[in-house]
Amino acid sequence: VTDEVVTEQVDYYRRRAAEYDETAYGDVAAARARIARLVADLRPAGRVLEIACGTGLWTEALAATAGQVTAIDAAPEAVAIARDRVRAANVSFEVADVFSWRAGTRFDVIFFSAWLSHVPAGRFEAFWQLLRDLLAGDGRVLFIDEHVDERGKEVYLAGRDEVVERRLNDGRRFRVVKNFVDPADLERRLGQLGWDCVVGRDGPDWVRGEARPARQPRR
């Protein structure tokens, strides 16, 4: 995946921000209830970093359980919506690309929803090393994403097994990275990188995962 595609992906989410909730979730009230349930089950606490916070639906739930939430996203239009939605005193937002962002602290929990599947395969290992560097000593990574069974709903570009074409409501087309999550495969890959990871399903469409750095990297 080229840098051009990654830049186009950010541009897509900038342009989609105003219509994101409706097109991603449909019934936003039902989505909020599901999100609240999942976050309560995952129990994020302490200092939480949310990567790719989008319009703030997950941030809203994280704020209820975390001591402090730092929420970042590369799309300023999405962050503006999130700031308006979530005005909790324990939440701060930043417009930032996670791959170039530098934190002034380490985090007890790093959380992301519908983000891992947008990480290019060529950046997968670097991304998880970045997470390791951002975690406190006993920290954990929590994530939600789409199960590989949902792959059929996307239109993959010819010869590009991780690049799909997405359209906005106005018809504009964008290239976006999309690597759906196969739970067993993800557990295996992270194990090879020195993570203890458990990935399960939540309904037919989503996966939920928890990962911690293993005490000894596997060889």
Briefly describe each language-model feature range.
Residues F111:
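A conserved beta-strand element that flanks and buttresses the S-adenosyl-L-methionine
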Residues A114-W115:
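Short catalytic micro-motifs in class I SAM-dependent methyltransferases
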